[in-house]
Each structure stands twice: as structure tokens, then as C-alpha cells.
Amino acid sequence: MNIPLVVRRLGVQDYNQVWRQMQDFTDQRNENTPDEIWLVQHPPVFTQGQAGKPEHLLNPGAIPVVRSDRGGQITYHGPGQQIMYVLIDIKRGKAYGRDISVRQLVSALEQSVVKTLAGYGVNAYPKAEAPGVYVNTDGQEKKICSLGLRIRHGCSFHGLALNINMDLTPFHHINPCGYAGLEMCQLADFVENGEADCDEVSPKLVTHFAEILGYNATKF
């Protein structure tokens, strides 16, 4: 049985615009709508999740702040960060012989990042108590990927943000994901110049995600 997955490369687009498109897609889809992945980068923006607390926004400066409907706390998006939004019909999994829970979807996102980074020689890992993906460098734990999902009508939207080759300075203006003092890192910290490129990393990320969840008809 073919289990299709449509992958869309959106380039660099405004956060609010893509957010509205995700909501519209989720509201309008039906049981026959193929699942989709949207690969995108955003201009600089801070986003507050539904659990976001204002005290974690320390000094936004000129960077806009958006109150989002995803789960989680505050994070930063900017050019050089690969966003992968996953628009998945979770409840349809049983029809394909798969029982996908929200926790399994989160795990699939985390493991797709872990496997992708392993291909670059980076040893990364998830944490059960703090969703996302982390790297231990010289005894210090740093976060390289943040996660946030919303489930509506049994379908997911939002997804992950993997730091590839970006300006990490704005993360110092917040408590990332609600953790004071949490240091962020990116793929460019661990590889040679030129290897940390969103266009090179994103197909690997999608391939691992599709394999983990059993998609066998991925269309870019």
C-alpha cells in the first residue's frame, strides 16, 4: 500500500502567513488529503507557544513577537534555521496499519533530527522531560532543535526548528523554551564550512522522518 507524503519547499516566508496557511490546510483537509511536510525559513521572529510565559521574553528589541497556537514556550526563528512543519492526519494511521500517537509523532521528529545529525558526525539526543534535541559539547549541554505541535481534528501542524547556520544572538534575548540559561548551538558549530546548509540538510531530514513513520511514496 502506498502511503503518500507531499513535501513542499517554501523558501523564506513570513511566520504569520505560513501559520495561517497551516490552519487553513488543517481545517479544509479530509480523509483523502495526503499528509504534507512544509520546509521553510522565517525572517527573524520570536514565537510564544500556548504555555509561553511573558517573563521568558527578556529583551525582544526590534524583533517581532507572535503569540502562536503551538505547544511549548518561547523560541526564536530566523534565516539559516530549517523549519519542518508536519501536517499529519494522526487518526488516519490505523487505516494504514499504523497507530500514531502524539508522543510517537514527537519521537519521530526527534529521531529524524538525531539520525540526520549523526550523518554529519554529530552525536545528538532527545530528553523525555524537555522535548527537542540536544548536543553535549565539552561537558555542556546545548539545544540544537526545538519542537512544538498543535493537534486539531486529529491532525497535526507546526513541527520542528533545527538550527543549521544562523545568527544565534537573539536566543540570548529570551529564556529558550522557558529554560533560563539554556545555551543553543547549530550544525555549523560542528562541521566544515559549507556543509551546514539548509538545502543540503532538509532532504535528509525528510527522508529519515518518512522512513520512521512508514511513508513509502514521498513526493518532493
From Swiss-Prot:
Upper taxonomic lineage: Bacteria, Pseudomonadati, Pseudomonadota, Gammaproteobacteria, Pasteurellales
Positions of the BPL/LPL catalytic domain: 31-217
Recorded family membership: Belongs to the LipB family.
Organism: Actinobacillus succinogenes (strain ATCC 55618 / DSM 22257 / CCUG 43843 / 130Z)
Subcellular location: Cytoplasm
Domain of life: Bacteria
Gene Ontology terms describing biological process: protein modification process
Catalytic residues (UniProt): 177
Site positions for Lowers pKa of active site Cys: 143
Record Gene3D superfamilies: Bira Bifunctional Protein, Domain 2 (3.30.930.10)
UniProt keyword terms in alphabetical order: Acyltransferase, Cytoplasm, Transferase
Misc. comment: In the reaction, the free carboxyl group of octanoic acid is attached via an amide linkage to the epsilon-amino group of a specific lysine residue of lipoyl domains of lipoate-dependent enzymes.
InterPro entries per record: aa-tRNA-synth_II/BPL/LPL, BPL_LPL_catalytic, Octanoyltransferase, Octanoyltransferase_CS
Record: residues binding substrate: 70-77, 146-148, 159-161
EC class name: transferase
UniProt protein name: Octanoyltransferase
